[in-house]
């Protein structure tokens, strides 16, 4: 593994640790998960850190500057998109690391039924980082018990 990749992984690990603390202390965050390549344990140098924040108040988490305690003051928003219920905010940090925040209503993790898009995210790799009410664990269990293509 190159020194550059090791440095990128250290920066990502530090960001993930901060995200766990942020999620645990922000009253608007009901749960948080790491998804994608870092959740699968297969990040590459170009991989971004993908975090999904569940909330009862999506608009509160979309307020500009809301994630500054997590990302730092010098982050740069490079993309904002909406994918169904998921509001994507992609940032480039001063270190060069890209971070993709997905802000979703808590119902995104519903298991009755599981949304096919949500199931795809879970199958692509999901590690629960903050889940005080067990919502993400129940979602992961429901998806794990199914097969791709099943109606959940």
Task: Place the predicted regions along the sequence by residue.
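Catalytic metal-binding acidic patch
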Residues: 36, 40-72, 96-98, 102
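Short, basic and Ser/Thr-rich N-terminal targeting/leader segments
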Residues: 28, 45-47, 85
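Helical scaffold of the NTase/Pol beta-like nucleotidyltransferase catalytic core
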Residues: 1-33
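Conserved NTP/Mg2+-binding pocket subregion across the NTase superfamily
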Residues: 1-8, 71-152
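Short secondary-structure capping/turn segments at boundaries of alpha-helices and beta-strands
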Residues: 18-21, 35-40, 75-78, 86-89
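Residue-level marker of motif borders
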Residues: 31, 43-45, 91
């Amino acid at each position: 593994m190159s020194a550059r990749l090791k440095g990128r992984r250290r920066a990502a690990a530090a960001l993930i640790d901060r995200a766990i603390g942020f999620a645990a202390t922000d009253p608007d965050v009901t749960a948080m998960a790491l998804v994608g390549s870092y959740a699968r344990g297969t990040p590459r140098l170009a991989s971004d850190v993908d975090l999904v924040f569940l909330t009862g108040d999506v608009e509160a988490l979309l307020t500009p500057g809301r994630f500054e305690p997590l990302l730092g003051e010098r982050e740069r928003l490079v993309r904002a998109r909406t994918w169904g219920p998921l509001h994507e905010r992609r940032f480039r940090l001063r270190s060069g690391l890209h971070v993709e925040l997905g802000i979703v209503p808590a119902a995104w993790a519903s298991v009755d039924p599981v949304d096919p898009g949500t199931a795809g995210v879970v199958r692509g790799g999901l590690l629960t980082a903050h889940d005080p009410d067990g919502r993400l664990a129940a979602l992961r269990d429901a998806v794990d018990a199914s097969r791709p293509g099943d109606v959940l």
